[in-house]
Amino acid sequence: MNELIKHKLELLPDSPGCYLHKDKEGTIIYVGKAKNLKKRVRSYFRGSHDTKTELLVSEIVDFEYIVTESDTEALLLEINLIQKNMPKYNIKLKDDKSYPFLKITNESFPRLVITRYIKKNDGLYFGPYPDSYTANEVKKLLDRIFPFKKCKNPINKVCFYYHLGQCCAHTICHTDKVYWDRLIDDVKHFLNGKDDKIIEDLRSKMLAASEEMAFERAAEYRDLISGIATMRTKQRVMSKDLQDRDIFGYYVDKGWMCVQVFFVRQGKLIQRDVNLFPYYNDAEEDFLTYMGQFYQDKQHFIPKEVFIPEAIDEELVAAIVPTKIIKPKRGEKKQLVALATKNARVSLQQKFDLLEKDIKKTSGAIENLGQLLKIDKPVRIEAFDNSNIQGTSPVAAMVVFVDGKPSKKDYRKFKIKTVVGPDDYASMREVLFRRYSRVKKEGLQAPNLIIVDGGVGQVNVAKDVIEKQLGLTIPVAGLQKNDKHQTHDLLFGNPLEVVPLPRRSEEFFLLHRIQDEVHRFAVTFHRQVRRKNSFSSTLDHISGLGPKRKQLLLRHFKTITAIASATSEEIQALGIPKTVVEAIQQQITDNKNDRSSP
């Protein structure tokens, strides 16, 4: 488990929602849903798992999540995200097929049926549901509460369901429109979560049955109430009108804005886009700028409708987005914008929490390091490393960490000027003297700690330069690597000793990052110098090829091999005369022949 995941786990909300696991490429490899995001996502990284789960966890390097209003919303969203992203760990479990809906037919005597096909103006549809089992469970519950007609064709006698109280036989039951309108309204309220009146009615019937000692009937009412509690289908994440729309929400805090966009296609929320950025003007103006860039830069599909928050001027949006702009005032559409806004707030708060934790973690590491070394808090650390290959193109590099963060504007590169051959001690002596004699002479900011890459010899050289040659009182430490070239020991003190540093401590991780960074910076610089030197030596003494033309060739082709592979026309295109190009090609050929000769 990496540091990013560790910190994100601490920030998960106790809310329902969906989580998306990602691999090192940023690809979504698994989508899941949870009643409690904190408990569910944390469970992946704690305790033991079966083989397939261990395999999944081994590939997770990051995750994100979407907060929903209910577990049902989370479940339906999970299905849509899986269908959209086809994560490799979900594909075997889910197939891409149409989803079941509940439908109240528009017949004279309406029926409640399950269908996978939607026809406009052919009845009322509720859903979609994740699978036929869920749809059937909801229908069974509705059948026990609302007596819809069960038979498709009229018959002249009551059916079996009538005797169970689950069918209103059209020959003897209510035939007036008011009855059916009221029944349909009750079902709509139930499926939209507004079931308090229904529950109260069932509770009254349960109490009445108990008073009449009809305990079996009372138990049936009790089970219905329990069934309603577990099968509510409050679907604000989904839209039943099959419309394509983008739903925008945003949140601002501490000079930052987070914009969250829900992409609804054919009535289903299939994906979301999250963008966090600093804003410098009025929040509403910057939001409008973002919308314009969103549809222009991303070549985004223009939906039939775009929902925007109430604070945004819809006329201005209409000027930059060529589609119908809606600012919902009430109902489900307004709740969808509110949900997008809520997720924007959650995402922005997570960013702040991660930053705060990172600051506290780094600050604590610096403070602890100072206490271990018995020095002042090393707010500014300067670290050095040499790089050469058998003494050729020797260079050194310095990186600077301020408050535990790289300060790249303060990085410095050094070409070794006075040392001949592979002598790391002499190279370190030269570089440190050049650096800190200038610090002393020009009154530059001195570090609180100097770190050299190396063992006892390197540290002693550094201390000799700093303390004896320059008379400075800057603490010097060394970072020793093991035989696997990994950070292993911190050397410090007089005499030098290995500082006891827990391998899993934040201070050790900080030192490891510093050593890796200075090594990377030194090696990168050495490659640049070596390539340039190789370039220069090969192209030296060619008439008509001065420093400017050499630099031009270096910037364009990067290597001698690339020049050798280029045509005369490609080289001449840089403005180099044909006679000079021929001389270059001849020189490269001669050098190649010399190297291949015995």
Curated annotation (Swiss-Prot):
Keywords: Cytoplasm, DNA damage, DNA excision, DNA repair, Excision nuclease, SOS response. Residues 196-231 form the UVR domain. Its main location: cytoplasm. The keyword DNA damage applies. Gene3D superfamilies: 5' to 3' exonuclease, C-terminal subdomain (1.10.150.20), GIY-YIG endonuclease (3.40.1440.10), UVR domain (4.10.860.10), UvrC, RNAse H endonuclease domain (3.30.420.340). Residues 14-91 form the GIY-YIG domain. The keyword DNA repair applies. Disulfide bonds: none annotated. GO terms for biological process: nucleotide-excision repair; SOS response. InterPro entries: GIY-YIG_endonuc, GIY-YIG_endonuc_sf, GIY-YIG_UvrC_Cho, RuvA_2-like, UVR_dom, UVR_dom_sf, UvrABC_protein_C, UvrC. One of its GO terms (cellular component) is excinuclease repair complex. It is found in: Cytoplasm. Interacts with UvrB in an incision complex. Belongs to the UvrC family. This is UvrABC system protein C.
